[in-house]
Amino acid sequence: MRLFLIRHAHAESGEPDESRRLSPEGREQARALGKRLADEGVRPDAVLTSPLLRARQTGDALAEVLACTSEPSDALAPGASAATVQSAIEGRGETVIVIGHQPDCGQIAAELGDGTEPRFPPAGMVELHLPGPGTS
């Protein structure tokens, strides 16, 4: 499975955490990331997001460019772990995009990847290759 783990794009400040929207810069970051993925031929089977507004907006922008839909998942709310991500993506196809938060994204990438915690700026992304059913 190809898992694209993405931190939500840049969000405005000054609102309660659950209500923070993408800033104009964040909307542009999300569209640009969607275009980059499309240009690389990425065709996701699923786009899953944290239920928080800024993550949903990032997912919607990506999905619009990639001609698919995005779906919020409570399993990806702040505090998500590698185990909750694996549970959320199970059975979702061979190529899945997950949009979440920091520090969760870095910790999840380290646990599911090579143990190194990558830097995750807003709209930062890591591609991970996870074993599928019957592989190790």
Sequence positions of predicted segments:
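Conserved ATP-dependent adenylate/AMP-binding module captured primarily in the ANL superfamily
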Residues: V85-S87
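Conserved beta-loop-beta/alpha segment of the NTase-like Rossmann-fold superfamily
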Residues: C105-I108, G115
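Active-site-proximal alpha-helix that buttresses catalytic centers in soluble enzyme cores
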Residues: R2-D74, G79-A82, G115-F120
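Alpha-helix capping/helix-boundary segments
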Residues: R54, D104-C105
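Glycine-rich phosphate-binding loop signature in dinucleotide/nucleotide-binding domains
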Residues: E40-R43, E90-E94
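Generic beta-sheet signal
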Residues: L3, R92-G100, D104
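Domain-level recognition of soluble alpha/beta enzyme cores
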Residues: G115-S136
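Short secondary-structure boundary segments
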Residues: P51, G100-Q102, G124
